Amino acid sequence: MSNKVQMDNDFMQMQKPFALFAKWLEEATVSEINDPNAMALATVDETGLPNVRMVLLKDFSSRGFVFYTNYESCKGQEILKSMKASLVFHWKSLRRQIRIRGIVEKVSTQEADVYFQSRPRGSRIGAWASKQSQPLENRFVLEKAIAQYTARYAVGNIPRPPYWSGFRVKPLSIEFWCDRPFRLHDRLLFTRDSVEQVDWQRQKLYP
């Protein structure tokens, strides 16, 4: 068995999903060229039709996985209706994938304020100027709004829009997947019945 296969296979013995996630994310940060914190976010509309898009993970802990968005956007509205979501991380350079399913909660006002102020000034202006997911007549309309808000907040702090905040996905299941030859991949699934539970059930899955 090669050293790489042996190293990749070691994860199958791990007992704590958040520790394993942290390890894989750290390794992806080194090997992945673009946005190692990018994740696919899946939601469903009121008819059950799924939507998926890429967003960026901005924080994680044993409480869950955090990203930020406009609550009036398509994804924001779909999450607010169901308060459920699924995430997928895929790191091609490592040939690894993580699937997460869980319930969603809003981050606190303090968390949202702190993160919003850490964003580049142009991004904060954009949060005010963009009516995310709404029809846009042409690019000029958006650029005009950007100019207006740039002038309005030319001096001093830019406040966080009331409709712009974050969500935390609190996982009920986390599955780790690692590529192996002949599609005989390694899969390790952690599940729990409630997000209040500290202990996880752990099982290996057939490829």
From Swiss-Prot:
Binds 1 FMN per subunit. It holds the Pfam family PNP_phzG_C. Its EC number is 1.4.3.5. GO terms for biological process: pyridoxine biosynthetic process. GO terms for molecular function: FMN binding; pyridoxamine phosphate oxidase activity. It is an enzyme of class 1 (oxidoreductase). Its cofactor is FMN. FMN binds at R53, M54, V55, L56, L57, K58, Y68, T69, K75, Q97, Q132, S133, W177, R187. InterPro entries: Pyridox_Oxase (IPR000659), Pyridox_Oxase_CS (IPR019740), Pyridox_Oxase_N (IPR011576), Pyridoxamine_oxidase_dimer_C (IPR019576), Split_barrel_FMN-bd (IPR012349). Substrate binds at K58, Y115, R119, S123, R183, L184, H185. It catalyses: pyridoxamine 5'-phosphate + O2 + H2O = pyridoxal 5'-phosphate + H2O2 + NH4(+); pyridoxine 5'-phosphate + O2 = pyridoxal 5'-phosphate + H2O2. Keywords: Flavoprotein, FMN, Oxidoreductase, Pyridoxine biosynthesis. Pathway: Cofactor metabolism; pyridoxal 5'-phosphate salvage; pyridoxal 5'-phosphate from pyridoxamine 5'-phosphate: step 1/1; Cofactor metabolism; pyridoxal 5'-phosphate salvage; pyridoxal 5'-phosphate from pyridoxine 5'-phosphate: step 1/1. HAMAP family: PdxH. Belongs to the pyridoxamine 5'-phosphate oxidase family. Homodimer. PANTHER family: PYRIDOXINE-5'-PHOSPHATE OXIDASE, PYRIDOXINE-5-PHOSPHATE OXIDASE. Catalyzes the oxidation of either pyridoxine 5'-phosphate (PNP) or pyridoxamine 5'-phosphate (PMP) into pyridoxal 5'-phosphate (PLP). This is Pyridoxine/pyridoxamine 5'-phosphate oxidase. The lineage of its organism: Bacteria, Pseudomonadati, Pseudomonadota, Alphaproteobacteria, Hyphomicrobiales. The gene is pdxH.
